[in-house]
């Protein structure tokens, strides 16, 4: 009887997908075209983008994340509360690998254009975006979390110009826009992670 119950429980649990979780203590850094290795948009994994970094941060178009092999699953989508964006593991990060081997989780997040090199201005922006401290992410997140830059009718209503309305409507909330726009206001280090 016990073996029948155990077999039933094991079979039932095998049908479940992974549950949402909020692992913490992640070191967070940023990278882009000028400091990628080699410089440019090439990434090590192909998760449907043709080996090119990118993403707006929605669930359907997550921003590229680099990390250590085995830290997260290749092509895994996570939610980044400190950015209010979804990210997908698509690239390798040498410093992340060194940190991971010492027990420190570390993710490196793509900041911008896949077609334009932002040069030193982009590297300076990445340094300003890096919040310091340690943060939680959401693994196996729901698809309906809020995303920085999605259309918000209240914000659009309050917008003072047509340009602001257009930016709100198109969901433009990049971290870096060449040649030198750094959007440090798109980082929310106090946002909690939750399932």
Predicted regions and their residues:
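Fungal secretory targeting signals
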Residues: 1-19
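Secreted/periplasmic proteins
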Residues: 15-195
């Amino acid at each position: 009887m016990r073996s029948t119950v155990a077999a039933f429980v094991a079979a039932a649990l095998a049908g479940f997908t992974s549950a949402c979780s909020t692992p913490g203590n992640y070191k967070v850094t940023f990278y882009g075209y000028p400091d990628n290795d080699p410089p440019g948009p090439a990434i090590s994994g192909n998760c449907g983008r043709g080996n090119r970094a990118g993403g707006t941060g929605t669930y359907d178009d997550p921003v590229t994340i680099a990390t250590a092999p085995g830290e997260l699953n290749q092509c895994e989508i996570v939610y980044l509360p400190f950015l209010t964006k979804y990210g997908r593991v698509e690239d390798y990060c040498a410093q992340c690998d060194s940190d991971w081997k010492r027990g420190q989780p570390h993710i490196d997040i793509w900041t911008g254009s896949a077609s334009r090199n932002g040069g030193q201005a982009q590297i300076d922006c990445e340094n300003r975006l890096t919040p310091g401290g340690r943060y939680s992410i959401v693994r196996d997140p729901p698809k309906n979390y809020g995303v920085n830059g999605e259309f918000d009718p209240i914000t659009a209503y309050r917008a003072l110009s047509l340009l602001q309305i257009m930016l709100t409507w198109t969901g433009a909330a990049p971290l870096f826009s060449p040649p030198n726009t750094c959007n440090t206001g798109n980082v929310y280090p106090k946002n909690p992670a939750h399932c």
